[in-house]
């Protein structure tokens, strides 16, 4: 129930428009940046190599199996790196700022995640991290005390809400852009006086609410794993399609064929990685993603058929 309330509250705040969402997100993000940076810097004082090595592959899995089990969570950490591109219509000078934000943001997240999580693994025993619903807060308990840990957890909850706010904003913008290009019904493109696609947001909220109810579990960790795998697969499918489209886009931009061929190796490696990630997420996630993709394809085909009939009727009326 709490998750559903937060979903709706974050969506309603987005009705205030781009600037309000941006300002609020810029404030809330510090609730996670500061604790993570503290762990990655002063956390080394509490770092115990013996605890770290005990947490290294505790189940003695072969390398292949260890990679398979961790790949979905790794990708989850980077989901959303395309947000700058998705929100390009709300960015000043997008041709310059979107590529900078995408590359810089991805590199920054990589450094922060790798540094902070490795330090945590050397502070808190692996079994305690595994059974905790708030691993960052637990780390601050080991570093300081319960009071400071509670303050940190409160700040990170606020930061997570800010991230949810951004996700709701980005999702509504993606559907708005798709609707403007004819891929989704026009209802997703209708905006209020603050340029917020209110009706589309309510439709998305209904879907999110149902998804939250269907994946409900007594264990927060189990529900998190289900949603992570489903989110990774449904996001990786568009990544594959985008990778396959890049050579065509490069040719349209007049890029030399020799340069495109050199990049084909990178594109191929990206496709293989994405397909392996889909496989690693498991059968249930693939089935759920297949259902979601199928629904999207049905909507797309129906929209195209409707647009074709409309254009044909218009042409007949002109003739």
What residue ranges belong to the model's regions?
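Helix-loop-helix connectors at the membrane interface of multi-pass transporters/channels
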Residues: 1, 35, 90-95, 100-108, ...
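Membrane-interface loop-to-helix entry segments
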Residues: 1-47, 61, 102-107, 232-240, ...
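Hydrophobic alpha-helical transmembrane segments of multi-pass membrane proteins
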Residues: 5-12, 68-75, 151-165
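Structural signal for membrane-spanning alpha-helices in multi-pass inner-membrane proteins
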Residues: 10-14, 36-43, 113, 117-121, ...
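Transmembrane helix-loop boundary segments of multi-pass membrane transporters
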Residues: 19-29, 151-154, 213-240, 254-261, ...
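Helix-loop-helix junctions that connect adjacent transmembrane segments
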Residues: 27-153, 285-288
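TM-loop-TM module centered on a large, flexible mid-protein loop between adjacent transmembrane helices
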Residues: 103-165, 184-231
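A generic transmembrane alpha-helix motif of multi-pass inner-membrane proteins
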Residues: 222, 234-238, 248, 261-319
């Amino acid at each position: 129930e709490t998750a559903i309330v937060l979903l709706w509250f974050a969506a309603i705040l987005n009705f205030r428009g781009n600037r309000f969402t941006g300002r609020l997100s810029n404030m809330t993000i510090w609730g996670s940046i500061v604790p993570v940076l503290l762990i990655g810097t002063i956390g080394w004082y509490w770092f115990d190599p013996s605890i770290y090595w005990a947490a290294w592959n505790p189940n003695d899995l072969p390398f292949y199996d260890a990679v398979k089990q961790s790949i979905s969570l790794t990708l989850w950490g980077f989901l959303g790196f395309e947000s700058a591109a998705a929100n390009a219509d709300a960015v000043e000078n997008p041709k310059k700022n979107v590529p900078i934000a995408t590359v810089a943001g991805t590199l920054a997240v990589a450094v922060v995640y790798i540094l902070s999580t490795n330090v945590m693994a050397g502070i808190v025993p692996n079994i305690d991290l595994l059974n905790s619903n708030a691993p960052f807060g637990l780390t601050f308990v080991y570093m300081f005390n319960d009071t400071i840990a509670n303050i940190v957890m409160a700040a990170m909850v606020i930061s997570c809400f800010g991230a949810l706010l951004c996700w709701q904003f980005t999702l509504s913008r993606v559907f708005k852009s798709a609707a403007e290009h004819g891929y989704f019904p026009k209802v997703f493109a209708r905006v209020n006086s603050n340029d917020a696609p209110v009706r589309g947001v309510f439709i998305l909220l209904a879907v999110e609410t149902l998804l939250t109810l269907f994946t409900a579990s007594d264990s927060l960790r189990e529900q998190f794993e289900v949603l992570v795998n489903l989110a990774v697969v449904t996001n990786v499918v568009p990544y594959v399609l985008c990778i396959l489209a890049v050579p065509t886009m490069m040719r349209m931009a007049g890029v030399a064929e020799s340069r495109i061929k050199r990049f084909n190796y990178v594109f191929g490696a990206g496709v293989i990685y994405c397909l392996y990630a889909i496989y690693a997420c498991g059968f249930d996630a693939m089935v759920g993603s297949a259902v979601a993709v199928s629904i999207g394809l049905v909507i797309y085909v129906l929209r195209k058929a409707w647009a074709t009939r409309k254009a044909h009727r218009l042409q007949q009326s002109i003739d």
